[in-house]
Amino acid sequence: MKNTFILGIEGTAWNLSAAIVTETEIIAEVTETYKPEVGGIHPREAAQHHAKYAASVIKRLLAEAKEKGVEPSDLDGIAFSQGPGLGPCLRTIATAARMLSLSLDIPLIGVNHCIAHIEIGIWRTPARDPVVLYVSGANSQVISFMEGRYRVFGETLDIGLGNALDKFARRAGLPHPGGPKIEACAKDAKRYIPLPYVIKGMDLSFSGLSTASSEALKKASLEDVCYSYQETAFAMVVEVAERALAHTGKNEVLLAGGVGANTRLREMLNEMCEARGAKFYVPEKRFMGDNGTMIAYTGLLMYKSGNTLTLEDSRVNPNFRTDDVNVTWIKEEEMKKVPEISPEAFLRAPPGERLDNGAEAVIYLDEGPEGKKVLVKERVPKLYRHKEIDERIRRERNRTEARLISEARRAGVPTPIIYDIEEFKLKMQFIEGVPIKYLITPELSEKVGELVGRLHSSGIVHGDLTTSNLLLAGERLYLIDFGLAYFDKSLEARGVDVHVLFQTFESTHRGHETLVKAFEKGYGSTFIDSKDVLKRVEEIKKRARYA
């Protein structure tokens, strides 16, 4: 059988890189990196760099391929990064790709840059159906495949982790690229400095962390601040990845993107996966940053599934989202089936037997008054987190949950009754119910909307609205897990709350559009400002990740 040869061009930001691959082999790759004299990336200068070197990069690539017996006439298609990325850079490499496509009379393939990071990781590791932690300059997302698309479970609400690291590095006077310099400085630290730790369900925010870290430089050493920044930011992304694992029941994590080259981040993810019994995969470092091979290989997958472009449809998209792509090259039936827990297992478990191993806590039953079952939620240490971060978070969330779960019940939201509070442990009413992630229907989604409407009317934001945190007991719906909850009546806070739930619908449940509409109906019936909040949800969803 004849090999398929695809030439791919990457040029979304710093790297201009081109490669030729087959189904099993990297034939050649050539890269020219834009390096500004000072500061961060300048889009027009980067585009000028790409324009200057595009011809020579392609020429060198074809020469290397020829040495291995591959001629231009052997090529089957030309793939290029269609987005997301910096507009001027994208337009430059798209022009080069179109010229090659026309001159060789072969198809053009527009590749989503983020998905290319995922596919190169799956190609170069044993991962098959992972939860993907994708952390690069402009993007920070937790992703997994379902129903023909890569779905986003959570993402940054402001700035990507890589850009946040670079921004802090510039303020600290460190040369570009900032990430490796921060990693090197962190190795000489002597203490941890408390910094903001911001997680909103499965979404993240890094802007406050960067600002606080810059302020900390006035009182602490550069080494200590770099160490503290890393420990805090990486703990946040690892926790979100663990939340996705717990919610989906999957047992693989794949690390993708340039920030994934950081050794400490890899260590933390590996520790988390070992504790959960999950497998952790990461490709070679050469495939973590932006590279032509990932574009060529993803282009090959697309080409073989009939996914090519006409010239008229080859416009670039600087805000091209991961979940906008119709993934034609993956067959749903070939993916691993996630085992679903039997609803009866929640009801039959004997005292002391672990019911659930969540991202925050372990859940088990105990004997209560008069022989009744009591649910115990114990926030156990997370070894991947720095001890100071871990103890602070577990203590704060335990107190918050005990207080706000009671406040929510007073506001008319069904929640478990708290019986006893310890430093890292809660004893509460055992609800003989089942998480609605196993049962969700439009009718249930409407009831969820009514519940959240009452919660928001009382000024409480849940902070972790997922279908794992809603229980159905008979005809009654209960809201649980208030560890990330807080009081806030702002449109932004309420919008993020609902956005997290909608992401869960889209990433985990089939027919998510009907679930969203049903929720909106229920939400509007109990919350007077629902229309304003839902409008804000749309704004949050459309926020660009490239600045």
UniProtKB/Swiss-Prot annotation:
It is found in: Cytoplasm. L-threonylcarbamoyladenylate binds at residues 134-138, 166, 179, 183, 262. Its cofactor is Fe(2+). The active site is at residue 464. Binds 1 Fe(2+) ion per subunit. Keywords: Acyltransferase, ATP-binding, Cytoplasm, Iron, Kinase, Metal-binding, Multifunctional enzyme, Nucleotide-binding, Serine/threonine-protein kinase, Transferase, tRNA processing. Fe cation binds at residues 113, 117, 134, 290. Residues 1-329 are annotated as: Kae1. It catalyses: L-seryl-[protein] + ATP = O-phospho-L-seryl-[protein] + ADP + H(+); L-threonyl-[protein] + ATP = O-phospho-L-threonyl-[protein] + ADP + H(+); L-threonylcarbamoyladenylate + adenosine(37) in tRNA = N(6)-L-threonylcarbamoyladenosine(37) in tRNA + AMP + H(+). GO terms for biological process: tRNA threonylcarbamoyladenosine modification. Its EC number is 2.3.1.234, 2.7.11.1. GO terms for molecular function: ATP binding; iron ion binding; metalloendopeptidase activity; N(6)-L-threonylcarbamoyladenine synthase activity; protein serine kinase activity; protein serine/threonine kinase activity; protein serine/threonine/tyrosine kinase activity; zinc ion binding. Residues 340-547 form the Protein kinase domain. Transmembrane segments: none annotated. Pfam families: RIO1, TsaD. Required for the formation of a threonylcarbamoyl group on adenosine at position 37 (t(6)A37) in tRNAs that read codons beginning with adenine. Is a component of the KEOPS complex that is probably involved in the transfer of the threonylcarbamoyl moiety of threonylcarbamoyl-AMP (TC-AMP) to the N6 group of A37. The Kae1 domain likely plays a direct catalytic role in this reaction. The Bud32 domain probably displays kinase activity that regulates Kae1 function. Component of the KEOPS complex that consists of Kae1, Bud32, Cgi121 and Pcc1; the whole complex dimerizes. This is Probable bifunctional tRNA threonylcarbamoyladenosine biosynthesis protein. It comes from Methanosarcina acetivorans (strain ATCC 35395 / DSM 2834 / JCM 12185 / C2A).
